[in-house]
Design a protein with these regions (language model features):
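Alpha-solenoid repeat scaffolds
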Residues: 51, 65, 79-83, 96, ...
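Ankyrin-repeat and related helical/solenoid repeat scaffolds used for protein-protein interactions
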Residues: 149, 155, 159-205
Length: 227
């Protein structure tokens, strides 16, 4: 392919990308200014273009930051919304401790999504760090079960979560990690010096029992990377 042809292809690709971006932004502006306030708020959060000022503008138009049982904040912390948009919702009165039907909260969903910035925003705004879901699992246990290791590590290092936390059935962080870890065992290796290795759940199962069907864990141990 000649150099001129290559440059033409690159120019066309750049033009397509610019057109897609401009079209998306025009759709965002339409949603922000034309749709009903609550619907505009949700569409803007989903679009990814939204900023703190956009959130404030839409709420001034009459959007409820907690409509539909806190759906805007839930959407923000679970998605790829910018940190400033989450701050905008919080500053406009979104309830950071709203409880969803399954007993979870916005902070739980931020943790499960691996969204460390959202976790820090919510915690700074007063979100309860000691909350638990119905089975007694705290934020750290849920993070490990979801393989959200960045947020799990943040909870331990910044907020002092106990690495030996357990739920109502006696399942610990180590047991959850042994069962659910796949490729990233650096978190488990990092935890090991502080872990209680001799604890069992209510059925008498220990971390080895939870990890016996985890071929990834067995492979890492075979390589000598984990005890």
């Amino acid at each position: 392919m000649a150099y001129s042809d290559l440059m033409l292809w690159l120019a066309c690709a750049a033009a397509v990308l610019i057109a897609v971006y401009v079209t998306g932004y025009l759709i965002f502006l339409f949603q922000k200014h034309v749709l009903a306030p609550d619907k505009a708020l949700m569409c803007c959060l989903i679009s990814g273009f939204v900023r703190k000022k956009d959130i404030q503008d839409i709420i001034r138009r009459g959007a409820d930051p907690d409509f539909d049982n806190g759906l805007p904040l839930l959407t923000a912390v679970r998605g790829t919304v910018r940190e400033q948009a989450i701050r905008g919702l919080i500053e406009c009165g979104a309830d950071v401790n709203i409880v969803y039907p399954n007993g979870s909260s916005p902070l739980f969903h931020a943790v499960l999504s691996g969204n460390t910035k959202a976790v820090e925003c919510l915690a700074a705004a007063g979100a309860a760090l000691d909350c638990k879901i119905k089975d007694g699992s705290n934020l750290l246990l849920c993070a490990v079960g979801a393989q959200a290791y960045k947020t799990a590590r943040l909870l331990v290092e910044k907020y002092g979560f106990d690495v030996n936390s357990k739920n109502n059935d006696g399942v610990t962080v180590l047991m959850a990690a042994s069962e659910f870890c796949r490729w990233d065992f650096s978190f488990l290796k990092w935890l090991q010096p502080s872990l209680d290795m001799n604890v069992s759940d209510k059925e008498g199962r220990n971390h080895a029992s939870y990890g016996q069907n985890n071929n990834y864990l067995r492979f890492w141990r075979f390589l000598g990377l984990l005890k």
